A protein has these predicted regions:
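Acidic, glycine/proline-rich Ca2+-coordinating loop motifs
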Residues: 1-350
Length: 350
């Protein structure tokens, strides 16, 4: 459908910012839909940019959802990771303005549609590791599964944790690390952060059609999914994750974007909806799906409190990416949410 209509069913295409040529200026890499080459724009330092995509060797034609610059081989320059359909592409920077696609990176094809990647040195060995989110098998055309049940689906493809061997080649450590726990969702995004201040990066995963994951780093190369215990499963339509200390108490709080729908709220809170979903718990799950975004305050004891409605940050329409940002320079973090989807000319009920 993407190629035929130009509509990306997995959301908008992302971009990455990084100084790929080491001149002290931030350059831009822009992901595109299938058939259009991705673009690398070199910053000239005077407010203008040059398109160096083809010269640099990163004009990928595959549908790309996101990219990240990171020094994955520890040679001092920024390499590039691109999430492209069912593949994760690693371009190694030669330090002279050109990239080479590494075919033997160790990334194994899963057949699933990949949506995003998060980077951190989870085992603190000095090498950056990758966590890769997968959504479904639409891009490959194989083993398509409709999310079942819709409000708490557990028939999605697995995500992957790749450990960096130190030379920008990777090994799949999903199972031995413990990240195979609850690893059957429809994942859109993940973000690393040390939420419990123990010095080890933890990981939150936003899943569509159901519960999210919070993988607490045990400090020995393994993780435990503590989302339920911490109070951040957030059973909804997870789209993105943002960490930030919104209340200035020195602890990282958690913002998760979902979907806000007035039509969905009207339908699911209608007494007649009980004829469709007789179980009260199921009805509550559908109602949560339409409530919108969530803000969880870090209590400092390994748990979080849902302060969404008190703070007033639930509304975001059909939300996608989100982030904390002090846009007015008052020393307090604000929240920015991108949103929107395909709709008709009548928008009053969105």
């Amino acid at each position: 459908m993407d190629e035929a209509t130009g509509i990306d069913v997995y959301g908008h295409n992302g971009m990455a910012v990084g100084d790929y040529d080491g001149d002290g200026r931030e350059d831009l890499y822009v992901c595109q839909p299938a058939g259009l080459p991705n673009r690398l724009y070199r910053n000239n330092g005077d407010g203008t940019f040059d398109d160096v995509s083809a010269v640099a060797g990163v004009d990928v034609l595959d549908a790309s959802t996101m990219a990240l610059f990171a020094d994955l081989d520890n040679d001092g320059d920024q390499d590039l990771v691109v999430v492209a359909g069912t593949r994760l592409l690693l371009f190694v920077n030669d330090g002279k303005g050109k990239f080479t696609l590494r075919e033997s990176s160790g990334f194994q094809p899963s057949g699933a549609t990949l949506t995003s990647v998060a980077i951190a040195d989870y085992d603190r060995d000095g090498h950056l590791d990758l966590y890769v989110c997968a959504y479904d098998f639409w891009a490959s055309g194989a083993n398509y599964n409709a999310p079942t049940p819709y409000y708490d689906a557990t028939n999605g493809p697995p995500n992957f944790l790749y450990r960096n061997r130190g030379d920008a080649t990777f090994e799949d450590v999903t199972a031995p690390s413990g990240m195979g726990q609850n690893n059957n969702r429809f994942s859109f995004a993940a973000s690393w952060a040390d939420y419990d201040n123990d010095g080890w990066p933890d990981l939150y995963v936003a899943n569509d059609f159901g519960r999210n994951n919070l993988y607490r780093n045990n400090g020995d190369g393994t993780f435990a999914d503590v989302a339920a215990k911490a109070g951040v499963e957030d059973l909804g339509a997870g789209m993105s994750v943002a960490w930030g200390d919104y209340d200035g108490d020195g602890r990282l709080d958690l913002y998760v974007s979902n979907m806000w729908s007035s039509a969905g709220q009207r339908l699911t809170f209608n007494p007649a909806f009980a004829d469709v979903a007789a179980d009260a718990g199921v009805r509550a799950s559908f109602q949560r799906q339409a409530r919108g975004n969530s803000l969880f305050k870090n209590n400092g004891d390994g748990t979080f409190s849902d302060v969404t409605l008190q703070v007033g940050v639930e509304f975001g329409s059909w939300a996608w990416s989100s982030g904390f940002w002090d846009y007015n320079n008052d020393g307090r973090l604000d929240v920015f949410v991108t949103n929107g989807f395909v709709t008709g000319p009548d928008t009053h009920d969105l």
